[in-house]
Amino acid sequence: MGNPRGRRTNGSIKTSKGTQRGTVSNLLSDQPLAARPKVSIVSNDDSQDSSDGGAFTTPSTTESTLKTTINGTDSTERNMSRKPSSPMAPAFMVSAPGKVIVYGEHAVVHGKAAMAAAISLRSYLLVTTLSKSQRTITMNFRDIGLDHTWNIDELPWDVFHHPSKKKFYYDLVTSLDPELVAAIQPHADAVSPDKPEDVRKIHRRSASAFLYLFLSLGSSQNPGAIYTLRSTIPIGAGLGSSASVCVCLSAALLLQIRTLAGPHPDQPPDEAEVQIERINRWAFVGEMCTHGNPSGVDNTVSAGGKAVVFRREDYSKPPTVTPLLNFPELPLLLVDTRQSRSTAVEVAKVGKLKDEYPVVTDSILEAIDQVTLAAQQKIQEISTNGISYRTLEDLGTLIRINHGFLVSLGVSHPRLERIRELVDYADIGWTKLTGAGGGGCAITLLRPDIKEEAVRELEEKLSAEGFVKYETTLGGDGIGVLWPAVLRNGTDEEGGEEIDQQKFENAVGTEGIERLVGVGVQEKREGWKFWKRSPRFS
């Protein structure tokens, strides 16, 4: 199977100061790292389709241009090129947030509206290109113990690129092709042979999503690469961890085949929206590999950030998405029950209830829809001066009502109810389950006038009963890119600090990851750029 690991020596990519890097896509300056200015990208949106056998090669001088901005002044645009013998592409990183469904879970699967908001817990994907002789791809998802390498030349390219099967980066894919799924199955089944079956099941789903996207968007001439993922999002807790990963994979692969432009400060709003939607569509394909029949809300909010009201009545058509760009940043108490559950199982539970009691279940789903729409109206009325206490109370009341309907659908859990009981007793906010239920997490919208002592007492009780608390914020950025994977934490003379792959893999916990890559609330470093929705699309 070739190089069994496909890894680079010492797991890092080092470039001495003053050495020019190879240029890949429209995202690199050809200046030395130490003197690299802030960069904005100008690119033609239809640069290349993914059927090109050389999809991962650098664009020619006629295919891309780069506009740099130094101290606020645009420099002359210049074409980029590199010789075939130029160095390998530098490592880059993408990051996408988790989400909470604030209103409308389960109803959204049945064509109703849901409101979801990005949270400050995120996934990070480091992409390291290997030498030409290393014909392997490695998927290293450290936080779930998945680390597997495939030989690129042994993958089923003939099936994925058959004229009757081939999909292009701009296509809308609303269902998985059974023949393509069957073609990757042996390769997905090969992962983690020594792991317990419950772990292998998770690993196989992750591998299936990765391979389906890789084979759909790439080509047999792809260079070898290592895809290293770390996440601060609790897994299996209803926080969109799998969608966050799929958004990262989608963005990374689309960047590698040069079909994304930007992000940059002066990117036209319609172009940014096209880029977000392109990432989102392929992330949804990955989600189908993972969940079977996902609603699409998780990947939509992870790709675009902030908050959205989402409705998908016809799965053969794109969903209706209304961004809520004035969604206020609200501190949230997020509590993990530590009770694992399956989204597919909980969705099937509601489906069965609907089959047995269609009129009653439809009434509950319609009521949840009305809760979501009422909350949307409240948020759209928020002024630039911030949210009023009355509006916050209204949103809290709707959270409480929504939770009651979810209990009626049978998707709560005793540990979720215990969290709600403890929070209600402390009287610090309004609580509901978020996501599929059956375990996972509860969210509490906090009152603005709570006493610190009450919060501390609640935290002690939650900890004593085995719950895990996260402090997070609603309404942050969506998909972002750090290209190259350099932290802008030095002076202009010093350049930046490259992300060492070994350090990235070994970062401990949420704080360690955030401290290293710096996107979350605790740390923010210059260098990350995010695609942002425009008010014209709200």
From Swiss-Prot:
Residues that hold Mg(2+) according to the record: S242, E287
Keywords: ATP-binding, Cytoplasm, Kinase, Lipid biosynthesis, Lipid metabolism, Magnesium, Metal-binding, Nucleotide-binding, Steroid biosynthesis, Steroid metabolism, Sterol biosynthesis, Sterol metabolism, Transferase
Annotated Polar residues bias: 9-29
EC number(s) from the headed UniProt entry: 2.7.1.36
Transmembrane segments: none
Recorded metabolic or biological pathway in which this protein acts: Isoprenoid biosynthesis; isopentenyl diphosphate biosynthesis via mevalonate pathway; isopentenyl diphosphate from (R)-mevalonate: step 1/3
Gene3D superfamilies hit by this protein: 3.30.230.10, GHMP kinase, C-terminal domain
Organism domain of life: Eukaryota
Swiss-Prot/TrEMBL catalytic activity: (R)-mevalonate + ATP = (R)-5-phosphomevalonate + ADP + H(+)
Keyword Heme attached: no
Subcellular location: Cytoplasm, Cytosol
Keyword Kinase: yes
Function, as annotated: Mevalonate kinase; part of the second module of ergosterol biosynthesis pathway that includes the middle steps of the pathway. Erg12 converts mevalonate into 5-phosphomevalonate. The second module is carried out in the vacuole and involves the formation of farnesyl diphosphate, which is also an important intermediate in the biosynthesis of ubiquinone, dolichol, heme and prenylated proteins. Activity by the mevalonate kinase erg12 (AFUA_4G07780) first converts mevalonate into 5-phosphomevalonate.
PANTHER family listed in its UniProt record: MEVALONATE KINASE (PTHR43290:SF2)
Protein name: Mevalonate kinase erg12
